[in-house]
């Protein structure tokens, strides 16, 4: 039943002869609950959501009042967030849809109504994560890679296609269309929805969650959204809210404008560095100030995209005139654009730089005119390097101690060389710092016509000067939508990119997520034989160890323009601002400034070729634009027929033996330590997305099931099969488990025998003994992708608790939703400080009385009988998370609730 507050807030406005209902935030000010003009715009969007969806049960008056008090009383309370829609990509989407199919089967098995297992909000899945760069630097690359993509993923695609017929409210954008976040920005986002609610046309802000951490890109157009794990997204699809503490909002005041030579990429990398230093994990970031009006929407989207890299839940740009201009540019309906402005102005959510600034938790100032051309690397996005410092910083990193900014090698590394004999008879020499991969990739940048056309102009000038890319550099171009192909074609710039080997290889994430494909065999052999430190330069958003390519140890993020420039140079061991890139056809040195376009050149080109007609043409038939997809043969049966012999899609074990009622929370006793890790363990480390090695537990499983090595595909593509994924948990080739000294990769010591073995093998031995497991970790545990399998795999290995110094937001939440207890060392404590070496038996004194953020007693019993006692913080951040844990996970809770209805 709706409350008095909600009923009083219900208002109407008229536009073009149509009446619309909305829930007026000003009512809260009139009732003395909030000063709306002082609230950050992102908080206003959240406040409208709880006000409109208040039902006096899940969302109550207390939630409205708590959020209205933002900025007072330390932001106490939590927000139940029910987004208006959900987006998925195929790597994380397949397991989400598998879980829905499994939930439906479980519901059927106990005689429940399977129609209760249907998305209650619109769901769009965009297939973008599966294409790999097998073929490149030739005109047939796109077709060849797409053909291979369908061959490798036919069963997965058949399953996703089945889901479009089996589930209500679910659509799939076919392969070779674009990257989910770019398709979302250019087409899916309405900015303001109008839906029929109780017979009334009701207007409200577009909000979403997505099963990809870079869902945050949509905040660039003023749509509030962020990445969640697949399990949380599934709950959202089924009408369950996400709960999180009322966030702090850090305001970033932008002034002035970007100078000549700097790009949106440079700004995004600078923001990432600044905000990582500030510490914004779990916080909202909102951009404001006079500099905002000097940023085209595409630049804002680039900055918003990288929120996971700076650690924030989102990086929000409120809707303003520039947002409406972008909607018009991308072919959105004129009447709808008019409605967006009218509604947001009526409801105090339309940004105007002349208005009074909101009051933020804290404010950071950033002068755009101070942004310089930059890269980030070699192993983390927040490690900014000015272009002018790149040569010396690379050389320093080679011999710096092994870690986030060093490789721990000695000076002799600079003397190493690898001689390459290509199959065509030509030869080349690669040395330390040479570039093996140069990729224009990732929605972070390919959604931005300024940097994409900028790269095309760099290519044009380079070709005209007679410059060429060395043969050992693997070049590729993988845009996030077909619109990019259209404007590169119409501008005449694609031919110059082709001349340099940046041919179109596919529409998808490719190199940015590790789908870089193989290097030439002769290059791989030479690099491996010499153990040569080679590099990549990519226009992506992540460069964690082992992510881009197993043989490429140093990876640098850069703008598409710099990707082209570095590809031409063939090495990162160069001062591009002062040393020549190469010799022109006239024999003269060619420098970066000779091929770098002016801001005006880029702007003029954008104005000329980026048009609404282009967007309308490319998106007019978006769900049916791929013939190979349309021809997939699928059944319309509502229950999925799981094939027990499939190595791609299996019915997961999460619901096996599920009781009607949850059990009690009980102490965890005599756990053994399976992994002891340092800082910055990423979800890539925990659950890699890339290649499956033949000698790994996952590889052996596939070989045992008669899968040829060439058909292994990637971990990411096999997330619908829990048997593969549990074997791939903690299996990243670069993860360093301190319990397996002298090894790198997924190994541990099995304490009963002292034998070093694969983590999966040890976990299964412990499971046979009935022994639970624990993981010890440092700061920022679980940073990176919103990878639910990092938590699912942890659960299936038998890990009962993780004890870390701090967590990244999404992974902590995912652990709880999979029934794994996240504990946090108290300030100033760590495994090392407490003298824990990992050989201990760990017990946790947790019981039914536990509450969020309680301190619990942890006992560590050493081999010699010595006892170490300490207290750890229970990282349940809301009461509902306590329920998730009690049920053994969120999906188990959803199933029990649906059965009880």
Curated annotation (Swiss-Prot):
Q: Its Gene Ontology biological processes?
A: propionate metabolic process, methylcitrate cycle; tricarboxylic acid cycle
Q: Which Gene3D superfamilies match?
A: 6.10.190.10, Aconitase, domain 3 (3.30.499.10), Aconitase, domain 4 (3.20.19.10)
Reactions performed catalytically: citrate = D-threo-isocitrate; (2S,3R)-3-hydroxybutane-1,2,3-tricarboxylate = 2-methyl-cis-aconitate + H2O
| Cofactor: how bound | Binds 1 [4Fe-4S] cluster per subunit.
Keywords from UniProt, A to Z, are: Iron, Iron-sulfur, Lyase, Metal-binding, RNA-binding, Tricarboxylic acid cycle
Q: In which pathway does it act?
A: Carbohydrate metabolism; tricarboxylic acid cycle; isocitrate from oxaloacetate: step 2/2; Organic acid metabolism; propanoate degradation
Required co-factors: [4Fe-4S] cluster
UniProt xrefs under CDD domains: AcnA_IRP, AcnA_IRP_Swivel
EC numbers, comma separated: 4.2.1.3, 4.2.1.99
Q: Which Pfam families match?
A: Aconitase, Aconitase_C
In which residues is [4Fe-4S] cluster bound?
A: 443, 509, 512
Q: Which GO terms describe its molecular function?
A: 2-methylisocitrate dehydratase activity; 4 iron, 4 sulfur cluster binding; aconitate hydratase activity; metal ion binding; mRNA 3'-UTR binding; mRNA binding
Provide the family line: Belongs to the aconitase/IPM isomerase family.
Q: Quaternary form?
A: Monomer.
Explain the purpose of this protein: Involved in the catabolism of short chain fatty acids (SCFA) via the tricarboxylic acid (TCA)(acetyl degradation route) and probably the 2-methylcitrate cycle I (propionate degradation route). Catalyzes the reversible isomerization of citrate to isocitrate via cis-aconitate. Could catalyze the hydration of 2-methyl-cis-aconitate to yield (2R,3S)-2-methylisocitrate. The apo form of AcnA functions as a RNA-binding regulatory protein.
Question: PANTHER family given for it?
Answer: ACONITASE/IRON-RESPONSIVE ELEMENT FAMILY MEMBER
The record's NCBIfam families line, in alphabetical order, gives: aconitase_1, PRK09277.1, PRK12881.1
Stated name of the protein = Aconitate hydratase A
